[in-house]
Structures are given as structure tokens and as C-alpha cells.
Amino acid sequence: MRLFILTRHAHSTLNVEGRINGDPSVPVPLTDAGRAAAALLGHQLSALGLDLCVHTRFPRTRETAECILQGRHVALIEERLLDDIDVGDLEGDTIADYRAWKRAHLRSDPFPGGESLDDAGRRYARAFRRLLDRDETVTLVVCHEIPIRYALNAAAGSDSLDAPAHEIPNATPFLFDEETLARAADGIEALSRPS
């Protein structure tokens, strides 16, 4: 059986500030508590033989991966298709501003200067399919809240990518077998399809 362990990056400085970051060139480090939580997750996963660790282009995901894997020799690869949503002109704004923009717009509306939630959803579905096409038995995926939320909700058969799972905690593992991740990719794609 193949296993995919999806986890959101550990607590970052922008999590503390309640601000959003959708640009991987903006450095956002982990907090001390975030590094400790990632190290704890690494300890919790130590009995698993990880074959691969995937992270996004965002430094906070790589830093989380390195803390989790400390002392282990596991291949690290970057998967840009799992990058956080490009929020364009909302970069650095508050979570409240981001949520207000979302409430006032459709999923198909791109953020000013960025991408739409549907665009990101289709990108995440492609990323999960790429992971499924690989041969590793146990893969750790360190990414962001939105792709994990979408995967959980789509795999559960929800008609919304944003519910019932809504907030994904940092540095918490979510386990998917091959069939469940494939169902998630199919569901995300179906719910992100252009109208």
C-alpha cells in the first residue's frame, strides 16, 4: 500500500501576524514554536520509512521539511504545482481582508494580479496526479492549508472544497492512501471546473 502524508508547513511569522503570503520569493521563516512542532512531527513519523519528501517553492515548507527530516536521508523535491494560491495584490494583507475579498467574489474570479481559487484547484489536482504517477511507497508532502483542505473535502465527497474541513492546523499529518488521493484529485478537478 502506498501512503501520502500531507502536512501544512509549521507555524510561520506571518501566521503570528495574521497575514497572507502567496509569493514564494517573499521570505517567511518559521517561528521557534514552528520549528519545534516540525521537529516533533519528525519524531512522530520516525518509525515510517519515508521514501520521498515533497515541498513547495515557499521557504517555510522547505524549512518545515528539513526540521521533520533532521538526521534522515530522504530525497527532497520541490513541486511548484502545490504552491500556495497567488493572491496577487493582496500579498501581505490580513487574513480578514483575504476572506472579505473571497466572500465578495466567485471562485472563478482571479485575485487582482493573481490567480483564481479554481485555477489553484486545478493546479492542485495536477500536482496530486503527478505524485500518484511516481513509484515511492511513502511520500511526505509539506505544503499549504488550501491544497490539504481541498484534498480532505474532495476525498470525503463534499460538494464544497471549503467544507466541512475548514481550517487545517500547522504541522499536523493527514494520511491518504493511493485510492483516497486519486479521489481527492478527481473531486478537486470536478469542483474547480470552469462553468
Question: Can you describe what each PLM-predicted range is?
Answer:
Residues H55-T56, R122, V142-C143:
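Short beta-strand scaffold positions
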Residues S158-G187:
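Domain-level recognition of soluble alpha/beta enzyme cores
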